[in-house]
Design a protein with these regions (language model features):
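Conserved glycine-rich, hydrophobic/aromatic-active-site segments
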Residues: 65, 111, 222, 304-336, ...
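Residue-level preference for the first positions of well-ordered beta-strands
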Residues: 231-233, 335-338
C-alpha cells in the first residue's frame, strides 16, 4: 500500500507538497519522476520486495513507460512473471510493481481485466504522450483526479490535490472501479472505459454444493492474498466474517496475532470484545485489545474527519475507532492486516435485502448495487483510516472476484 500522485498540472514543488500531505500512506521512500511537463510522485510502504530496486516511480528498461502504483498483486499473478521474465529485463527479485508495469507493456489495456489484486495506478507512456489510470474491479483503494483545460492531476487522496494545487473539492472526480482512463496529453482528451461488470446471473445449485464452493473459494482467496515479505496480522472483531478470516489465517500463519477495538466489555450486551475474546480463546490466538472511551472519540473527531475526508457520521463513527486500532497494529511492528470487510455486501446480509425473494430481479439488483457502491463508503473510509492511523495495509479476501 502506498500513495501516488502525478500529472501535467503538478510542478516539482507542488507534487512534493502533495506527497507530504499524504505521507501517512508510506514512509519507506519518497521519490519524484520528471519528464518535460509530466511529474509523477510516490510514497512507498514496502511490502513485496523490500529492496530499493522496487522503489517508485518505476521505469521500464527502455525508458518509455513509468508507473506509480498503490496496491498489491496476488499469488495468482506469479505465473505471468514467469512468462514475462523470458522476454523483458526484470531488475527486481519479486516486485509486483515491475510485474504490473510489464503486464501493461505486453498486453496494453487488455491487462486490466487480467489483473488479480487490489490496485490504483498510473502509467506514463513517454513515446505516445499518454497517461493510463486504472482501478481494481471493486475499488478497494481510493483514487482521485482533476481534469480541466488540458491539464490532469491525480492522487490517492483528495488532500493530495486540494492543498498543493488549491483545487476545490467539488471539482475532484473519482477514478471509478472496474474502469481504466487514458489521457491524451497532446490533444488534451480523457477517455474512460469500463473493463469489468459484476456478473448479473443467478446460478441454482444444491445447498450442500453451494456451501462447499463458498468454503473453497474463501480458503483460496485467503491463501491467494498471503503474499508478503513482512509479517501479517488479523482483525478479530467477533463477527462471523472476521472469525472466518482469522481461522483460515491461523492455519497458515505462525504466531498469528489478532486485534480488536472496543469501548469496553459489557457482559449484558455481549459486544464485539466479548465475542472476540471467545473466538481468540477457541483458536488459541493472542488478542490485542484497543480500548477507547467517549472522551477519546470526542477529542479525535477532527483528526478522523481529516483522515477519511468526510464529515458524515456514518463514515466518521467507525473510522474514529479504526485509527487507534491501526496505530496499535503499527506499534506491534505490522504493516499488513487482514479483515472481513465486504462479506455483508457479497452475501447480501443487510436486513432490507430480505424484502425480496432471492430469485427476484429486485433482490439480485440490490445485491449488485451493494457491491458496486462499496467503494463510495466502507472501502475508501477504512483504507484512509488504516493508513492515517498507523500506515497499515488492509486486505479483504471476501472481495476476491471469484466470490
Amino acid at each position: 500500500m502506498c500513495g501516488i500522485a502525478g500529472g501535467n498540472l503538478f510542478t516539482t514543488d507542488t507534487i512534493k507538497e502533495s506527497l507530504d500531505d499524504t505521507k501517512h500512506r508510506g514512509y519507506d521512500a519518497q521519490l519524484v519522476y520528471e519528464d518535460d511537463d509530466m511529474v509523477l510522485g510516490h510514497n512507498r510502504l514496502s511490502i513485496q520486495d523490500l529492496s530499493e530496486n522496487a522503489n517508485q516511480p518505476f521505469t521500464d528498461s527502455t525508458g518509455r513507460y513509468t508507473i506509480v502504483y498503490n496496491g498489491e498483486l496476488w499469488k495468482s499473478m506469479l505465473r505471468y512473471r514467469n512468462e514475462l521474465e523470458k522476454k523483458y529485463d526484470f531488475i527486481t527479485k519479486n516486485s509486483d510493481t515491475e510485474l504490473l508495469l510489464y503486464m501493461f507493456v505486453e498486453y496494453k489495456e487488455k491487462c486490466f481485466e487480467m489483473l488479480d489484486g487490489m490496485f490504483s495506478f498510473a502509467i506514463y507512456d513517454r513515446e505516445e504522450q499518454k497517461i493510463w489510470m486504472g482501478r481494481d474491479w471493486v475499488g478497494r483503494l481510493p483514487f482521485y483526479y482533476f481534469h480541466r483545460k488540458g491539464k490532469l492531476a491525480f492522487s490517492s487522496e483528495r488532500k493530495g490535490l486540494t492543498k498543493s494545487l488549491d483545487v476545490r473539492n467539488k471539482h475532484i472526480k473519482v477514478v471509478l472501479p472496474s474502469h481504466y482512463y487514458c489521457f491524451h496529453i497532446e490533444d488534451k482528451r480523457l477517455e474512460k472505459v469500463k473493463y469489468y461488470s459484476v456478473p448479473n446471473r443467478i446460478v441454482e445449485e444444491p445447498k450442500d454444493e453451494i456451501v462447499k464452493n463458498i468454503r473453497e473459494k474463501i480458503e483460496l482467496a485467503v491463501d491467494n492474498e498471503l503474499i508478503s515479505d513482512v509479517p501479517v496480522c488479523t482483525i478479530l472483531s467477533g463477527g462471523i466474517d472476521s472469525v472466518i478470516i482469522t481461522y483460515l489465517l491461523s492455519k497458515k500463519v505462525k504466531n498469528l496475532e489478532a486485534f480488536v477495538v472496543s469501548n469496553g466489555i459489557d457482559e449484558k450486551k455481549k459486544d464485539d470484545l466479548y465475542y472476540a475474546r471467545k473466538a481468540s480463546e477457541f483458536m488459541k490466538i493472542p488478542l490485542n485489545e484497543v480500548i477507547i472511551d467517549d472522551e477519546y472519540v470526542m477529542s479525535n473527531l477532527e483528526d478522523t474527519i481529516y483522515a477519511v475526508e468526510d464529515h458524515k457520521w456514518v463514515q466518521v463513527s467507525p473510522a474514529v475507532a479504526q485509527l487507534p486500532m491501526s496505530k496499535a497494529i503499527h506499534e506491534k511492528g505490522y504493516k499488513v492486516v487482514f479483515g472481513g470487510e465486504g462479506s455483508d455486501e457479497i452475501f447480501g446480509s443487510y436486513g432490507h435485502i430480505f424484502a425480496w425473494k432471492w430469485k427476484d430481479d429486485d433482490y439480485h439488483q440490490a445485491r449488485i448495487d451493494l457491491i458496486e457502491k462499496l467503494h463510495e463508503k466502507n472501502l475508501v473510509r477504512t483504507n484512509k483510516a488504516m493508513m492515517y492511523g498507523g500506515t497499515v495495509e488492509l486486505r479483504t479476501p471476501f472481495l476476491d472476484k471469484t466470490l
